[in-house]
Structure formats: structure tokens, C-alpha cells
Amino acid sequence: MSLTVEETTARNTELINEVLKAYPDKTAKRRAKHLTTQEEGKSDCNVKSNIKSIPGVMTIPPCAYAGSKGVVWGPIKDMIHISHGPVGCGQYSWGSRRNYYIGKTGIDSFVTMQFTSDFQEKDIVFGGDKKLEKIVDEIQELFPLNKGISVQSECPIGLIGDDIEAVSKKKSKQYEGHTIVPVRCEGFRGVSQSLGHHVANDAIKEWVLDKMDPDKNQFVATPYDVAIIGDYNIGGDAWSSRILLEEIGLRVIAQWSGDGTLAEMENTPKAKLNVLHCYRSMNYISRHMEEKFGIPWVEYNFFGPSQIEASLRQIASHFDDKIKEGAERVIAKYKALTDAVIAKYRPRLEGKTVMLFVGGLRPRHVIDAYGDLGMKVVGTGYEFGHNDDYQRTTHYVEDGTLIYDDVTSYEFEKFVEKIEPDLVGSGIKEKYVFQKMGVPFRQMHSWDYSGPYHGYDRFAIFARDMDMAINSPVWGMAKAPWKA
């Protein structure tokens, strides 16, 4: 029997209080600000966010280096991105994001390659600027078709005061204006990977867009040019988004970072509209282009038919009747397909509950995709969200929904144990914990090696994967050794 809003709110409030009892008083007081239930009239879900995690508790947010190199810069395929510092940061994050791209790896595309300055003790003592210069020389010799280089600083670089900006300027001049971008994304900076996004956006602004030679770019604009910003092509998502935009009559002149190029970044100021997928990681550069170049931007959501329809109409509203009619034509074209998907999977998933804890946009964007299948998200939260992320979340969640910011491992496990959702959607670090608890799980950062999930036809993949996770017969076949 489903609970009323009042009963759900009371249960979740009691659960929050129970979880907080495990902490010392000071810690409990701090964590209480991050845990709540959604109430009507609360414009930001009434939680505190973007605050440093408490030392001593196990939390999930990544660092600023991950936000810059792993999210924003890393997928730019024709640039080489140096993990500047000890080998571990680049090595252990190597190829983990499934940023699909087209190109010849090692020739004109470098996304899945790992470039590191491999700092040793002597580099810490004497500095690594000369080593960085040598690395740039080696890159230019070994990979002559690269279009640019970014220097992604790891923690020691900031601590010892290396001047990566001076090195970048010197080597860029030596190689006749070759784009070399220093990025101050040391992991100790800021609260989470979110500052890494911001730093990376600032680097794009200062070292790419503001340094462009207007005479070099012979790009010919049209009235229907758009740029896809903040789609990282996880499992091919950006390609699916691009197809829909082109089907309604728009011309996609750039998509980045996923399967993106330096030239596309440089073309973006010619767009008539920037369509923004991941608000958290790329709203900064979108706002900059709006202020400097007068390009409006709109956040879109291509997860599930309900949000795709709304987003296509919102995007089309910025153009003339040709594009508006194109949007309606595309919506009608795919209706039979999505109706068939819903008819197949909704009876199997109706009433199933989901708890989410992910980064970026997913804690809110996928909610209506679950709703299209008759499923209900009963708890959600952000790894590195800000106040404006939670403001945007209020439009997606129902009153009584459990909201948790920067949730600790203990809290999340306890919430799942007590609420008993039918599915948990989170990251790789959480996956095996919950599967060992017997809870169906989907990895919602990189789609568990599936996807893409964007677009009408890809909604079928999303529905299949959720059904496969929840209704797999394996849950009835596996028994704990002590129950066998």
C-alpha cells in the first residue's frame, strides 16, 4: 500500500533523525543541513550544498582535477591532455568515462590515451617546469597532428608553485601559436569536482575563446546554427541528441566536450543558440558567451519522451516557424515508437521505486524518464550540487521525496536499507555494496556499459536496462551462504 505525502514525510523525517544519532553532536548538526524531505514552497529543496565534506566520513564527491580533466577537457578528442603531476591521478581515472569519439587514436584523436608528466621526488624538490617543456616538445614530435595541448594540474603543482602559465605561453610562441592551455585544477582546490568545472570553463574562456584570431575562422553561419554544450557523449548520448536537433531542422556546428574538437569550440561563438545538457559543469561558459557574444542558452533534457517533447519545443521556440513545425513533426514521428516501449515495459515496472545519487544533472533529469515507465523516484541527491541545482530539482520531485546532499556511505546504505527501493541508481563505488545487499542497481554515471539513453529511440534501451535490473531472475536464484 502506497503512503500518503504526510506519511512519507513523517517516515523520512524519522529516518533522517535515526541516521543522525550515529554521529557526534557537532557532526550530526552539520549533516542535518544536508538531509531533508521535499516540501511545497521550498524553492531549493531546503538543503545546504557545495560545502566541504566532513573529515572522517566516507563521501563520494571527486576532486577538482576530476572535474576539469575527467569531465570538461578530457573528451576534446584532437587535443592532448597532460595529467601534470604524479602518475596515479591520470592512471586510475584512465578511460573510465566512456566518452565515445570518432577518429584514429594516437593519430588525430587522443581521448583514450594517458599522458602524464610522472612526477618523481626530484621534480617536487627542483620543480617541474623544465620537464613540462620537454614533454610539450615530445608531444609535438610524436603526435604532430594534435590541435592543442592542455596541462591539467594535479595537487603537487599548486603546492610547489610551478609556473605552468609561463611554460604554456613560451611553448605556444615557440610552436607558432599552437594552442596550449594551462588549467589550475589541483585536486585540493574547492569543495568537490565542481570547482574543477568552473576552472576548466575559465580556461576555455581565457585561453581559447578570448585568444581566437577572427581572420583565421572562415566559418559561414546560418540562421539555424546551434551548439551542444556539456554533453560528454557517454555511450554515444551526444550523437543521439545531435540527431534529434538536426531532424527538427537545426544545424549543429559544435558539440563539446563529447566527440568535440578545438575547432568546434572556436566555432561556438557563431551559434544562434547554445543548448546546454549538463548545467552544473558548463553553465559558466554558457553565461560568458551570452554576455560577450549575445548567444542565448537553454538547458535541455532528452531523457524519456515527456522531457524530450518539452525540450524540443523549448529549443524550437527560439527559432522561426520552420523549426517549430519541425519539432512537432519529430514529436509525432516517434510517438508510436515510444508508445510501444511504454506498452511493453510499463506493466513490468509500474509502481517500482527508485533511489538516485549521482552527479551533474542526472539526479533530476532522469526522474521523468522513470515516470514515463510508471516508476517513482523516492529519494535523490547530488554528489557536488549547488543551490541552483536543487532549485531546478523541485520541478521534478514530489512532496515527501527524501533529499540528501553529499550523502555519506553510511547514510545512503541506511536509507536504502529502511526504504527498500526496487532499484538504486548511483556510481561504480556504490554498485557492489548494494548488489551485495540484494538490491538491483544501475550505474547511472556511464550506463553500466550500455546506453545511449538520450533520444526517443534510445528510451527503449533505458527501459530495457531498468527492467533487466529489477526483474532479473538472478535475485531469486542467489542465496546467502548462511541461508543455503
Curated annotation (Swiss-Prot):
Its cofactor is [8Fe-7S] cluster; [7Fe-Mo-9S-C-homocitryl] cluster. GO terms for cellular component: molybdenum-iron nitrogenase complex. GO terms for biological process: nitrogen fixation. Keywords: ATP-binding, Iron, Iron-sulfur, Metal-binding, Molybdenum, Nitrogen fixation, Nucleotide-binding, Oxidoreductase. It catalyses: N2 + 8 reduced [2Fe-2S]-[ferredoxin] + 16 ATP + 16 H2O = H2 + 8 oxidized [2Fe-2S]-[ferredoxin] + 2 NH4(+) + 16 ADP + 16 phosphate + 6 H(+). InterPro entries: Nase/OxRdtase_comp1, Nase_comp1_asu, Nase_comp1_CS, Nase_Mo-Fe_asu. Tetramer of two alpha and two beta chains. Forms complex with the iron protein (nitrogenase component 2). Belongs to the NifD/NifK/NifE/NifN family. This is Nitrogenase molybdenum-iron protein alpha chain. It comes from Herbaspirillum seropedicae. The gene is nifD.
